[in-house]
């Protein structure tokens, strides 16, 4: 099994490289790529950690050597948010970066499972899909927006608020990966009794948690460490699925189009990537209303990505 990280010299990428070196199964090959010349050094650095994961680093304009033979590709390349920016402000720069990298994926490892971390995910996943489609290699079972950080934050905040064991707290999060499109299904959390006045503030805190980190870092970065852990968890789940284990994760994929062309919901992962898209289950009145309210925003985000490729 080979996992490639594109954008491995960045804030998320370096932390992700470390976590994957520690957490991937023994015998996995880990390829680290970034345009920055420091990248082979990042690979040497993590290669000194004693685990049976083999690491190689690549830098320069062309990611092809890192992509050759890859089963899983994680894309975290791009610019990060700064105070006053929202994820959509990143679009102008990151859209072109994702397009360029996916064009290489389409040529070099078209059957790989691709996890998009680069924001704005609602839009960059649509860009990736259209590039793969133009190349004639699009398989919707193999393209994912990594929304796992919304799940991690939900688990953390719910466990804190309700005094639950965080390792046993599970919160499905549906929709997209920015602002109002992030919808934690708090009504489905086991062992949590909710007062009406708790739901809305907690939902808003989860939706705005990325901004909380950006502001707290005072211009010094965005959520890199928690995002890296979220991406590492998703990568481990993908690798388990590809190896024949049954794993369920919430992730942003192209499904039946009931709510939007791309939508984050629980997905059973397997040997072909998406094995089955699971139902979102019963919603509270608050959640149903929030879902209906977010859809125009989510659909517009997706359309922006489609138009970026198709004009």
UniProtKB/Swiss-Prot annotation:
<keyword id="KW-0520">NAD</keyword>
<feature type="binding site">
    <location>
        <position position="94"/>
    </location>
    <ligand>
        <name>NAD(+)</name>
    </ligand>
</feature>
<dbReference type="InterPro" id="IPR001252">
    <property type="entry name" value="Malate_DH_AS"/>
</dbReference>
<feature type="binding site">
    <location>
        <begin position="7"/>
        <end position="13"/>
    </location>
    <ligand>
        <name>NAD(+)</name>
    </ligand>
</feature>
<dbReference type="GO" id="GO:0006099">
    <property type="term" value="P:tricarboxylic acid cycle"/>
</dbReference>
<keyword id="KW-0816">Tricarboxylic acid cycle</keyword>
<dbReference type="InterPro" id="IPR015955">
    <property type="entry name" value="Lactate_DH/Glyco_Ohase_4_C"/>
</dbReference>
<feature type="binding site">
    <location>
        <position position="81"/>
    </location>
    <ligand>
        <name>substrate</name>
    </ligand>
</feature>
<feature type="binding site">
    <location>
        <position position="34"/>
    </location>
    <ligand>
        <name>NAD(+)</name>
    </ligand>
</feature>
<feature type="binding site">
    <location>
        <position position="227"/>
    </location>
    <ligand>
        <name>NAD(+)</name>
    </ligand>
</feature>
<dbReference type="InterPro" id="IPR010097">
    <property type="entry name" value="Malate_DH_type1"/>
</dbReference>
<dbReference type="InterPro" id="IPR001236">
    <property type="entry name" value="Lactate/malate_DH_N"/>
</dbReference>
<feature type="binding site">
    <location>
        <begin position="117"/>
        <end position="119"/>
    </location>
    <ligand>
        <name>NAD(+)</name>
    </ligand>
</feature>
<dbReference type="InterPro" id="IPR023958">
    <property type="entry name" value="Malate_DH_type1_bac"/>
</dbReference>
<dbReference type="InterPro" id="IPR001557">
    <property type="entry name" value="L-lactate/malate_DH"/>
</dbReference>
<comment type="function">
    <text>Catalyzes the reversible oxidation of malate to oxaloacetate.</text>
</comment>
<feature type="active site" description="Proton acceptor">
    <location>
        <position position="177"/>
    </location>
</feature>
<keyword id="KW-0560">Oxidoreductase</keyword>
<dbReference type="Pfam" id="PF00056">
    <property type="entry name" value="Ldh_1_N"/>
</dbReference>
<dbReference type="GO" id="GO:0006108">
    <property type="term" value="P:malate metabolic process"/>
</dbReference>
<comment type="subunit">
    <text>Homodimer.</text>
</comment>
<dbReference type="InterPro" id="IPR022383">
    <property type="entry name" value="Lactate/malate_DH_C"/>
</dbReference>
<dbReference type="Pfam" id="PF02866">
    <property type="entry name" value="Ldh_1_C"/>
</dbReference>
<dbReference type="GO" id="GO:0030060">
    <property type="term" value="F:L-malate dehydrogenase (NAD+) activity"/>
</dbReference>
<dbReference type="InterPro" id="IPR036291">
    <property type="entry name" value="NAD(P)-bd_dom_sf"/>
</dbReference>
<feature type="binding site">
    <location>
        <position position="153"/>
    </location>
    <ligand>
        <name>substrate</name>
    </ligand>
</feature>
<comment type="similarity">
    <text>Belongs to the LDH/MDH superfamily. MDH type 1 family.</text>
</comment>
<feature type="binding site">
    <location>
        <position position="87"/>
    </location>
    <ligand>
        <name>substrate</name>
    </ligand>
</feature>
<protein>
    <recommendedName>
        <fullName>Malate dehydrogenase</fullName>
        <ecNumber>1.1.1.37</ecNumber>
    </recommendedName>
</protein>
<feature type="binding site">
    <location>
        <position position="119"/>
    </location>
    <ligand>
        <name>substrate</name>
    </ligand>
</feature>
<dbReference type="GO" id="GO:0005737">
    <property type="term" value="C:cytoplasm"/>
</dbReference>
């Amino acid at each position: 099994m080979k996992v490639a990280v594109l954008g491995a010299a960045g804030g998320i990428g370096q932390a992700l490289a470390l976590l994957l070196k520690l957490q991937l199964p023994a015998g996995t090959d880990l390829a680290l790529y970034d345009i920055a010349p420091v990248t082979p050094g990042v690979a040497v650095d993590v290669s000194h950690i004693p685990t049976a994961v083999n690491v190689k680093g690549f830098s320069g304009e062309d990611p092809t050597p890192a992509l050759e033979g890859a089963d899983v590709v994680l894309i975290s390349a791009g610019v990060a948010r700064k105070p006053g920016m929202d994820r959509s402000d990143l679009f102008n720069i990151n859209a072109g970066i994702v397009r360029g990298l996916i064009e290489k994926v389409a040529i070099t490892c078209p059957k790989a499972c691709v996890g998009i971390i680069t924001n704005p995910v609602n839009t960059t996943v649509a860009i990736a899909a259209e590039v793969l489609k133009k190349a004639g290699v699009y398989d919707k079972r193999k393209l994912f927006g990594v929304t796992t950080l919304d799940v991690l934050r939900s688990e953390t905040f719910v466990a804190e608020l309700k005094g639950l064991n965080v390792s046993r707290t599970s919160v499905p999060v549906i929709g997209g990966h920015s602002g109002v499109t992030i919808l934690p299904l708090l009504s489905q959390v086991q062992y949590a009794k909710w007062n009406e006045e708790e739901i809305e503030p907690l939902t808003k805190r989860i939706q705005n948690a990325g901004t909380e980190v950006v502001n707290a870092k005072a211009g010094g970065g965005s959520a890199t460490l928690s995002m890296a852990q979220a991406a590492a968890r998703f990568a481990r789940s993908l690798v388990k699925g590809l190896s024949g284990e049954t794993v369920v994760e919430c992730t942003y994929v192209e499904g039946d189009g009931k709510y939007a062309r791309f939508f984050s919901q629980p997905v059973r992962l397997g040997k072909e990537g998406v094995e089955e898209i699971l139902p979102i289950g019963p919603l509270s009145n608050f959640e149903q209303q929030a879902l209906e309210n977010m859809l125009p925003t989510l659909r517009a985000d997706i359309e922006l990505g489609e138009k970026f490729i198709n004009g």
